[in-house]
Amino acid sequence: MELKEGKKNDYRRKLGEIWPELTAFLDQEKVHNFSIWNCDSLIFGYYETDENHEFSEEKKNQIQALTAKIEDTFTWISTPGENMRLMYHNFGVVRENKELIRHRMFMTKLKPGCEEEYKARHDGLVAAREGKIDPGPDSNFSIWSAGGY
């Protein structure tokens, strides 16, 4: 999402207003590792579900109703409800203590027409690892694409 000019405080206030309803929904649907972060006026959200989880039409309608309460503060830069595309991964050591994991986020905007080349190059890096687990501190690293970012 991209915040509309001058709407950052409105977005934060409205998100706070729907937060109890949103977190209750996430708990009910067994959504975990939910996070929201921003880079300037861009807002990204992330969550995980069990592998074969799909939201029912009723649940999708609930999501749309919650979104409608804050939608006047942003425009979509990706397709609502569509998963981000995994561009690269190095999922390595599963850490018992999640507090030790470094959480970092960076963002870049791909030049038009470069997404497939970017993906192909990173697929080559994944193939070169030949399935070996990286024990280093930066394992469990992934790159996702949402709306060209």
Positions of PLM-derived features:
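Glycine-rich beta-strand-turn "strand-cap" elements at beta-sheet edges
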Residues: 34-41, 64-101, 144-147
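Short glycine-/aliphatic-rich beta-strand segments at the starts of folded cytosolic domains
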Residues: 1-12, 100-116
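Short amphipathic alpha-helical segments
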Residues: 7-29, 114-137
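Short, glycine- and small/hydrophobic-rich beta-strand elements in well-ordered beta-sheets
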Residues: 23-49, 130-149
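Intrinsically disordered, low-complexity acidic/polar segments
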Residues: 8, 45, 54-55
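Long, contiguous hydrophobic alpha-helical segments, chiefly transmembrane helices and signal peptides
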Residues: 43-45, 106-110, 118, 122
